[in-house]
Swiss-Prot record:
EC number(s) stated in the UniProt entry for this protein: 4.1.1.37
Molecular-function GO terms, alphabetical: uroporphyrinogen decarboxylase activity
Annotated CDD domains: URO-D
Native source organism of the sequence: Shewanella baltica (strain OS185)
Role noted for this protein: Catalyzes the decarboxylation of four acetate groups of uroporphyrinogen-III to yield coproporphyrinogen-III.
Protein name: Uroporphyrinogen decarboxylase
Gene: hemE
InterPro entries, sorted: UROD/MetE-like_sf, Uroporphyrinogen_deCO2ase_HemE, Uroporphyrinogen_deCOase
Length: 354
């Protein structure tokens, strides 16, 4: 593997000194870029794009050609794991992801098998190894998965949900069934993420997109417990250096202390959290990633630059901060505004790393 030329993202996650605050964007390979739209049209549909390792590599690299980003993230989807379990993933126009065979009974859960990442998910591993090779050491490659709870919400609901009625009914009326599902998913995610590391991922992120829908105690029981299990089972060293792990629960600002106890290296923050407060609470234990509101990228560029300065000042001096948005970039953002955001982070953060 080529030697890493820019490792400030990995260094910041491990709280080692950096020259400027590293920055990348969730969904940086996405629909706001005209070149992404062209490649997706070539693929035909979203899952065909994910399953073609050469095109997945191409869209992963596209934002790096435009912007001075400090990390690349595998182009894939969190629902690859339930898809590999045979649920029949498809995308409904305007509806988002759907499953032909929801996992909403204990019998359906018992029948689920744990997918082999090198077989049913081999297309993801091929994408990881291709991207790592094509990066040629420019920046680190982030691998990722959805959290067991978040994957389970889609599997039980049969797709996206605003109320989470079916999975919450299972959680409170049939908790043993849900725990069986979450346990299988945790085992699947451990294998999946470790295979990503074996194929070249240099950092890992667990996206708990819907953990914030849970009550205080239910979050610990149904989400955090299974993310803890995953962290305990992960490969933490590869290529002679640590593989940092970032946990991100959207709406998880209440639980930062509990999340920091898992042994992860960093916590992702959404835009509802004050980063200065987060650093006071858990900054002695973990690095922090975030956390500008993605909608701020619709603002005039001077306002974006002002907000970047506000967040950098909130975090303050020293390492341990990876700048990002508080969630994925919106599809209608002007690419020039994204570029101004990235430049502002690097330019304004130098003063905090003397």
């Amino acid at each position: 593997m080529a030697e890493l030329k820019n490792d400030r993202y990995l260094r910041a996650l491990l709280k080692e000194p950096v020259d400027v605050t590293p920055v990348w964007m969730m969904r940086q390979a996405g629909r706001y870029l005209p070149e992404y739209k062209a490649t997706r049209a070539q693929a035909g549909d979203f899952m065909s794009l994910c399953k073609n390792h050469e095109l997945a590599c191409e869209v992963t690299l596209q934002p790096l050609r435009r912007y001075d980003l400090d990390a690349a993230i595998l182009f894939s989807d969190i629902l690859t794991v339930p898809d590999a379990m045979g649920l029949g993933l498809y995308f409904e126009a305007g509806e988002g992801p759907r499953f032909e065979r929801p996992t909403d009974t204990i019998d359906a859960i018992k029948k689920l098998s744990i997918p082999d990442p090198e077989d049913e998910l081999g297309y993801v591993m091929k994408a990881v190894s291709t991207i790592r090779r094509e990066l040629n050491g420019a920046v680190p490659l982030i691998g990722f998965s959805g959290s067991p709870w978040t994957l389970a919400t889609y599997m039980v609901e049969g797709g996206s949900s605003k109320t989470f009625e079916k999975i919450k009914k299972m959680a409170y009326a049939e908790p043993m069934a849900l725990h069986m599902l979450l346990d299988k998913l945790a085992d699947s995610v451990i294998l999946y993420l470790n295979a990503q590391v074996a194929n070249g991922a240099q950092s890992l992120m667990i996206f708990d997109s819907w953990g914030g829908a849970l009550s205080h105690s239910a979050y610990r029981e149904f989400s955090l417990h299974y993310m803890q299990k995953i962290i305990d089972g992960l490969t933490r060293f590869a290529d002679g250096r640590k593989v940092p792990v970032t946990l991100f629960t959207k709406g998880g600002g209440l639980w930062l202390e509990a999340m920091a106890e898992t042994g992860c290296d960093a916590l992702g923050l959404d835009w509802t959290v004050d980063i200065a407060d987060a650093r006071r609470r858990v900054g002695h234990k973990v690095a922090l990633q975030g956390n500008m509101d993605p909608s701020m990228l619709y603002a005039p560029i001077p306002r974006i630059e002002e907000e970047v300065g506000h967040i950098l000042a909130g975090y303050g001096e020293g390492t341990g901060h990876v700048f990002n948005l508080g969630h994925g970039i919106h599809q209608h953002v002007d690419p020039e505004h994204a570029g101004a955001f990235i430049k502002a982070v690097h330019a304004q953060s130098k003063q905090y790393h003397k």
